[in-house]
Amino acid sequence: MPKTKIAVACQGGGSQTAFTAGALKALCQAQGQGRLKDEFEFVSISGTSGGAVCATLLWYSFMKGERPVWQRMMNFWEENTAQGPVEHAINRFIVESVRMVNSGMMPTLQLSPSSPVMQSMMEFMTAGQRMGFSDFRGLLEKHIDFAEIASWGPQPKPPVLMLGAANVTSGALAKFVSTQEAIRVEHVLASCAVPNIFPAVQIGADAYWDGLFSDNPPVEELIRPRSVGEAHIPDEIWLIKINPTASRRVPVKPGEIVDRRNQLEGNISLFQQLGHLEFMNDLILADAFRPEFLSRFDIKAPVRIPKSFHSDADKPYHIPCIEMPVEFQDLLDYEGKIDRGSENISKLTAEGEKAAAVFLRERAAAVAASSLNEDQTAGQAKSRGEVPDGLPLARWKDPS
């Protein structure tokens, strides 16, 4: 029986993507321990910002054939977490300073991350600290051998890695894809370059900012043969979501407004991409594509994707996404995305593992329900004397 092809898309969110690391760990453990009813394989992994870091670390371990495949990623997060009283004090100072600015209790000091003043301030605050705490590029290079990746060149075999960033000058939505070029540390840094924290990352003649301004995360491109290859079109896209879709209250305080605005901005491109995929899925169900075209890309049915909004009508190809429970979301704020305190990181990682377990159960139920509908529809067609289509997707039609 062929394995279910899975694309995993990891949304950005700074330190809160420790949740993503926990979720990816749980997914890999479930795959390796055979605890899923149907076997699956990761054919592609995409990510933006902190999601790009998690995706790259996991992809690198896959490429090297490491076991457990998630260990390198978790080692990175352990070293990226504040350690000892001095680092925790620096971390608290940064987080609380930003919180006071966002709440209106402290005036905003607008400094460019490229300015000598800002660079001197950061050097002073992190002087004598571990590289893992003070040197993001150095930390990435410690856990990923980019020289080794360069020696590989473009990698056609799965999983395909795709990182999102934004071209500052042209405005183009940039994607760095492992099938097209060797992944560089600059690609990861570009995807993480939040403008008010990091300077734009120069790659060749172009400069890049955080992927929040492009695809957060890349989703639509995961089904395009030009990016992932004809053999790696996924059957399902598993989304690890950081920014909540809904809010239980209208933000009134300055800090609440900053937080909700950041969440909405982080979801705009995601919902647009999911909307495009829904439209494509509906066209497939309407027989808008020739069977030979679908067969060329091994498309037997619509790609399973999550809804954009919980209030959207249910469709046979919908599956849940991996997201934080509402009660946990209520405890977080914008400043938590820069909080590298050990308590914050460990809670996020643990919540990610639990959310992945919930997702696997709910996904299995959704797939089983749609399969039951397929069988019922096929049985009704047979009883009416209809000749079934040669493709399995004909059985996805809602019974009428």
Which residues fall in each region the model found?
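Patatin-like phospholipase
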Residues: 1-48, 53-400
